[in-house]
Regions:
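NAD(P)+-binding Rossmann beta1-loop-alpha1 motif at the extreme N-terminus of oxidoreductases
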Residues: 1-37
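A structural signal for isolated positions on well-ordered beta-strands in alpha/beta enzyme cores
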Residues: 11-13, 85, 107, 133, ...
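Residues at the C-termini of beta-strands that transition into short coil/loop
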Residues: 16, 35, 47-49, 88, ...
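Short alpha-helical
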Residues: 19, 65-66, 91-92, 142, ...
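Internal alpha-helical scaffold of NAD(P)-dependent oxidoreductase catalytic cores
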Residues: 23, 76-77, 99-105, 120-220
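Rossmann-like NAD(P)(H) cofactor-binding subdomain of soluble oxidoreductases
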Residues: 37-122
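Short, flexible turn/loop "capping" segments at secondary-structure junctions
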Residues: 51, 124-127, 234
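NAD(P)-dependent Rossmann-like dehydrogenase/reductase catalytic/cofactor-binding core
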Residues: 142, 152, 201-261
Length: 261
């Protein structure tokens, strides 16, 4: 939104609610990058999708447990030519959307970013390299290239790989093992790596076998790559699911743990 602000190349809309919506309307969405803050002003921020009308591309970035309710609420922005790109955690997201909207064009997607909402309308980003992957092997390639160009113009590290299913499994592999162990032991990532690495490895190999049963060939070193990814995280950091358990909030345990079981 910051990159397209004041241009005619694209209109970026935010659909939000409650205190987040109020803050975005007053100050834009703010992203804190260390000592620097980026202010983004969308063309419109609203809790009423009907004010927007049918979109070309709809990025769905909600929690997985809100997916069905949110898709119903978003129907006013979903037209016959709208492409839905879900960036949710989970392996069955496309299927769940098609259960609600049969025949709608849905691409697959995932994003790598370390961030958290510190207050309404303010996001702290602590990752060093963000990446967004999207695609659909059966979708029109020109349309996918169009979106790729839009994202790259916004200076995002965007990729449209042919192996999008593998990319999503790799992302899920990393977050499922970490979310499950940090939540089960009620410990930080650093504590899990130091104290329970054997269980982390066991869960990793179990998930790898599930992937193979689904026809996904993960790299031989996937388990230890996931461990290495956790080791470079700050020792006191944890997962979103663990944080939600600590706060007594609703969690994505069914998506990140239950689905595998």
């Amino acid at each position: 939104a910051a990159r397209y602000q004041g241009t005619i190349k694209a209109d970026i809309f935010f659909i939000a609610r409650g205190e987040n919506l109020k803050a975005i309307r007053e100050n834009g969405l703010q992203m804190q990058l260390g000592i620097r803050t980026i202010h983004t002003a969308p063309a419109l921020a609203t809790d009423n999708p009907a004010e927007i009308g049918p979109a070309d591309y709809l990025f769905c970035c909600t929690k997985s447990y809100d997916l069905e309710e949110n898709i119903q609420q978003l129907k006013p922005v979903i037209g016959p030519k709208t492409v839905i790109i879900p960036l949710l955690n989970g392996l069955d997201i496309e299927e769940r959307i098609h259960n609600i909207l049969p025949g709608q064009e849905v691409w697959k997607g995932c994003v790598y970013i370390g961030s958290r909402l510190t207050e309404p309308g303010v996001i702290e980003k602590f990752s060093l390299k963000e990446r967004i992957f999207f695609g659909n092997k059966d979708a029109n390639k020109d349309k996918q290239t169009e979106l790729l160009k839009l994202l790259m113009y916004a200076r995002l590290n965007a990729f449209n790989p042919a192996d999008i299913d593998l990319r999503i499994w790799k992302k899920f592999f990393m977050i499922s093992t970490a979310a499950t162990t940090t939540s089960y032991f009620n410990e930080t990532i650093g504590e899990v790596v130091n104290n329970h690495i054997d269980l982390f490895i066991t869960l990793g190999y179990e998930l790898k076998s599930v992937a193979e049963a689904k026809g996904i060939r993960l790299p031989d070193g996937q388990v230890f790559s996931a461990i290495d990814a956790q080791k470079i995280m700050p020792n006191n950091s944890t997962t979103s699911m663990h944080s939600d358990f600590q706060k007594g909030n609703r969690t994505e345990v069914e998506t990140l743990t239950g689905y595998v079981v």
